[in-house]
Amino acid sequence: MNILIIQGGSNHDLPSGEDTVILSDWENLTKEHNVNIEYIENPKGALKKIFGLVWSFDNYARLNFFLDKYSPDVVHFHTVTPYLSLSVLYAAKKSGARVVQTLHNGRWICIEGGFFRDGMYCDRCIGGCGVYGVIKSCKYNKTVSFCFFMVNFVARKSMMLFNFVDKFIAVSEFVRDAHVRSGFPASKVVVINNSVGVNLKKDKD
C-alpha cells in the first residue's frame, strides 16, 4: 500500500511532539508499506495566512503535486488547521485516496488548541460552537481568535471536514470524547495512542 503522510510546517527549529510521532509512525509503517512524508510549509506573510485560512489555493496546488508524484492509496494528515486549510483535505479526497487525520490536540474545536486558558484547563468550547474562545481572546487577540473560530465553525457546520476525511485518529480517549461531544461522527473517530520508545536492553553488571 502506498501511504503519503502530510504535516503542516512549523515556525520553530526544534522538532515538535507531532514530528516525533510522525517519524515513529513512519518507522512502523515502512515495515509493511511504501510510505512517504512531505511537509507543507506555513504561508509567509499576514495576508497570505489570513486569506488562506479557509481555503489555501497554494497548498491545494502543493498537495496535488505530491498526489501526482506518489499516487497514494492513503493520505494521512497530521496538522491541518489553521494554515493548510480544508483545501488539502478536498484535494486528497478528490484524488480517490482514503483520507485520514490524526487529532493530536483540539484545534478543530478549541482555537487555542490545547484546552488551556490563563494557564489552566478549560473545556468551555467542548460541545459548543467555540465562540467563548473569541470572547476571551484565546488566540493572541480577538481578531485572530475570530478568524480561527470561523475556520473551525465553517469546517464543522458545513460538514466539509467530515465529508473530506474518512477516519480521524484520536491520540487518547479524552481527545476522542471531546471531538465526539463537539459534533464529530463517533463512527469516524478511533483511538490509537502515541507509541512510546522503550529500551528493553538490560545493562550489564
What residue spans do the PLM features occupy?
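N-terminal subdomain of nucleotide-sugar transferases
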Residues: 1-43, 68-70, 88, 95-98
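Nucleotide-sugar donor-binding and catalytic loop/hinge architecture
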Residues: 1, 199-205
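Short N-terminal targeting/anchoring amphipathic segment
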Residues: 5, 66-84, 97-107
